[in-house]
Curated annotation (Swiss-Prot):
One of its GO terms (cellular component) is phosphopyruvate hydratase complex. SMART domains: Enolase_C, Enolase_N. This is Enolase. The gene is eno. The active site is at E204, K336. InterPro entries: Enolase, Enolase-like_C_sf, Enolase-like_N, Enolase_C, Enolase_CS, Enolase_N. Keywords: Cytoplasm, Glycolysis, Lyase, Magnesium, Metal-binding, Secreted.
């Protein structure tokens, strides 16, 4: 299982922007391939996504520099090494880059290589990827957090909250969970049409209508759930990704669609009122990534009622997560492999979270590819929850379809209502 050659290429993501894909070719002829997503709403401390910044090509968004780094330095450094030792490969990649945020080689170049090595290993062993990724954690089929109403940076509309998600916790297994979500998605389209609202979709496949308030969004979802024949609060609960850093300006959080602005305490009260009115199980990035005093207050007041997920807050970084744990901030972490840049560091963040009673949510990015690696990683890590968008657009459904295949192979338990246990 030794590496013969690594080569990369520039491909397009789901937004039509360039991204990188890497092939790790082993001496036995096996080829492991991986491509890297890109976010729109990003944390300031994410690992560096290397772009060319050439205005004459792809408006500066090309990734030929990252491709060159893979084809030259990375290829030379890893040739002849075994893909059986993922930590060693990732350590060498980080040493080769030798920056805190992977800005020399680019986290996109490093991650494409790291994930392609893991896939090459699975193929060489003739085992499913989720099996070779598992490190002894109890594997489960995750509850999908289905983003069927889009706003914020993921849509061209007036909605402030970035993602309104449904979680089919009452399903007996993953295929039924997917069926429930899909049926609600299609009913929601008819509900929107009936009210004269736009049914165009945003970056992650959810509908992106202009509506009057965040409560109206939740009311529309509630109506669709009921009309689809499901029980709100029993079969389905809500999850929100506020992406509050996108709303924060000059000390206040601005809800433009509602013509309101809040300080941290007022916004926490706003969430408390929403939670009392709707079965909301999870709130992601409820406050700005730098508002740690506000986060501490949010966790104290609402942490025993809902899952409080840090995305921009923690950026899948074990060091930052450790700071949050020490200060009692949030109670869950969003896992995005491209925020940190290697599989090994991603695993470190997951383990650190588990060891300290934090939940993990596996996640895609708004600019995705057809790569399904995160579906296998969600199962392998036993995180029990996955965010991979709505129920349309192949870049989103590819992950759901991979989970269906895994479910067929593995007969694993569905996380279901267990994720609500605090």
């Amino acid at each position: 299982m030794h590496i013969h050659k690594i080569q990369a290429r520039e491909i397009l993501d789901s937004r039509g922007n360039p991204t990188i894909e890497a092939d790790v070719i082993l001496e036995n002829g096996i080829i492991g391939r991986a491509s890297v997503p890109s976010g729109a709403s990003t944390g300031s401390r994410e690992a560096c996504e290397l772009r060319d910044n050439d205005p004459k090509r792809y408006a500066g968004k090309g990734v030929q520099k990252a491709v060159k780094h893979v084809n030259e330095e990375i290829n030379q450094a890893l040739q002849g090494l075994s893909v059986s030792d993922q930590e060693n490969l990732d350590r060498i990649l980080c040493q080769l880059d030798n920056t805190e945020n992977k800005s020399h080689l680019g986290a996109n170049a490093i991650l494409a290589t790291s994930l392609a090595c893991a896939r090459a290993r699975a193929l060489s062993l003739n085992q499913p990827l989720y099996m070779t990724l598992n490190q002894g954690d109890m594997m489960t089929m995750p509850v999908p957090m289905m983003n069927i109403l889009n706003g914020g940076a993921h849509a061209d509309n007036n909605v402030d909250i970035q993602e309104f998600m449904i979680m089919p916790i009452g399903a007996p297994d993953f295929p039924v969970a997917l069926q429930m979500g899909t049926e609600i998605f299609h009913v929601l389209k008819s509900v929107l049409k009936k009210q004269g609202l736009n049914t165009a979709v945003g970056d992650e496949g959810g509908f992106a209508p202009n509506i009057q308030s965040n409560r109206q969004a939740l009311d529309l979802l509630s109506e669709a759930i009921e009309k689809a024949g499901f029980r709100l609060g029993e079969d389905i609960v809500f999850a929100l990704d506020v992406a509050a850093s996108e709303l924060f300006n000059e000390g206040f959080y601005h809800m433009s669609s509602e013509n309101q602005k809040f300080d941290s305490h007022q916004l926490i009260e706003y969430y408390a009122n929403l939670i009392s009115s709707y079965p909301i199980a999870s709130i992601e990035d409820g406050l700005d990534e730098k508002d740690w005093s506000g986060w501490k207050q949010l966790t104290t007041l609402l942490g025993n009622k809902v899952q409080l997920v840090g995305d921009d807050l923690f950026v899948t970084n074990p060091k930052i997560l450790q700071e949050g744990i020490a200060q009692g901030i949030a109670n869950a972490i969003l896992i995005k492999v491209n925020q940190i840049g290697t599989l090994s560091e991603t695993r470190q963040a997951i383990k650190l979270a588990y060891d300290n009673g934090y939940r993990c949510v596996m996640s895609h990015r708004s600019g995705e590819t057809e790569d399904t690696f995160i579906a296998d990683l969600a199962v392998a890590s036993g995180c029990g929850q996955i965010k991979t968008g709505s129920l349309c657009r192949t870049d989103r459904t590819a992950k759901y379809n991979q989970l269906l295949r895994i479910n067929e192979l593995a007969s694993l338990p569905y996380a279901g209502k267990n994720i609500l246990k605090r």
